[in-house]
Amino acid sequence: MKKLVLVLFVFTLLVVGCKHGMNPGVKGSGKREVQKRELQAFTSISSQGAFNIEVVSQKTLSFEIEGDDNILPLISTEVSNNVLRIKNIKGFSISEPVMIRISVPNLEGLTVSGAGKIDISGLKNDKFEIDCDGAPTIKVSGTTKVVDIDTSGAAKIDTHNLRASKGVVDSKGVSKIDVDVADQLDVTISGPSTVTYKGDPTINKTIHGPGKLEKRASEGA
């Protein structure tokens, strides 16, 4: 138990250090600017950094980024193999977070390495995958046949407004995950993560350590 506490303490220090800039690099000017960037089509997003991202699934494709005017050139947004990759090309420190707004016709996957807040709405597809390493906060709403979540670190993932027929969750670390699954839920937990579910699915679970699988209380109960 002492070893686990030490690991979590060190992890927290690393996350806080990254957020506030132990190696700050370029200092933000404080002058906010909004850029629109033209991008090729993509079906998945990879975020490496501490960005606040809002994604809406709709017919048109658009990308807008807001932040300090001298910081925006340091953020790379490239599409390769149908994946939009968002990352820093140089370290920086800022007083307000970088804000990214995206609309995309079809989003099938999200990969996050780092922190930040990500909100995805309007999904309607056959499968949606989330793979994250770090301490992001993620919210997703819409409908899908299969939701597949793989986490390590201290993620907070709220998909209880993403209606799915099947859910697959593999959580390592101290994550908190909330899902809405109708038919089948497969859960593997390693460590003190908590998975909460809504619905009445058939459950297959494997839990190593103090992790928990809990049914969400009915609203208004």
Model-derived features: positions:
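Positively charged n-region of N-terminal signal peptides that target proteins for export
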Residues: 1-4
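C-terminal motif of bacterial Sec signal peptides marking the signal peptidase cleavage site
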Residues: 14-17
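Short linear S-[DN]-x-LW-Φ motif typified by the pepsin-like aspartic protease active-site region
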Residues: 19-91, 97-103, 198-199
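Extended, compositionally simple hydrophobic/Ser/Thr-rich segments
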Residues: 35-36, 42-55, 92-102, 106-221
